[in-house]
Amino acid sequence: MFTGSIVALITPMDDNGDVDRASLKSLIDYHVASGTAAIVSVGTTGESATLNHDEHVDVVMQTLELADGRIPVIAGTGANSTSEAISLTQRFNDTGVVGCLTVTPYYNRPMQEGLYQHFKAIAESTDLPQILYNVPSRTGCDMLPPTIARLAKIKNIVAVKEATGNLSRVSQIQVLVDDEDFILLSGDDASGLDFMQLGGKGVISVTANIAAREMVELCALAAQGNFAEGRRLNQRLMPLHQHLFVEANPIPVKWAAKRLGLMANDTMRLPMTPLTDPAKRIVEDALKSAGLL
């Protein structure tokens, strides 16, 4: 469940900025039909930053209910306060989520020892499997391979989502981690195939929101070692990988999902604003290049 194409699911909202349950069900059904390995609910792409604590929990619980056991659900539980991250994580004990994705603390920029103690405390507060999430471009905080290796020794820390785009990190982590069951996942669609060729086991993907079957196929080709065919597919998807970040994620991917009829609205809460017209043209061209339009 922690390998293959895992979607970093967008959170559909109605015109008032409330969760659009009908569109959420539509998205989940789409991923079930497409063979997506798992859903990450309320991560960065799910707009965790603009949902309050209770709303965050509610979206994950609605996702669990609508998934109804058809696809595993991973809860995003990151916070830049250790106590808040523990509280959020513990809300999902015995709910049916299969694990938690926890981002490094953002803005306060802890030292490596602080990162170790932060994730250790969270892991020790629950039996739920934990996926570390390193995305320094968002957080201003880079969790280095030696720290990841220390954390990998903790029983229920089972994986890391590496979103630096730095492919050398794969081998650096592999050399330092002596547990062959510890899973490396790419958090960067554009370098995801190369990441898997170096030993990664999948991608937690933004692109999968709108190209679910294609990302499932890409990860399957990588798992089979068929990188020649994988590169042909990835070349077609590359404009999407790149241009879904033409403006801040998840602005472009929400517009694309609406454009493809996967959900009713591309509403976001401030300070996130709608996709601009020039960016719409760029994303539209990427959708056409990928064969989605």
Curated annotation (Swiss-Prot):
The gene is dapA. Disulfide bonds: none annotated. Pfam families: DHDPS (PF00701). PANTHER family: 4-HYDROXY-2-OXOGLUTARATE ALDOLASE, MITOCHONDRIAL, DIHYDRODIPICOLINATE SYNTHASE. Its main location: cytoplasm. Belongs to the DapA family. It comes from Yersinia pestis. This is 4-hydroxy-tetrahydrodipicolinate synthase. It is an enzyme of class 4 (lyase). One of its GO terms (biological process) is diaminopimelate biosynthetic process. Its EC number is 4.3.3.7. Homotetramer; dimer of dimers.
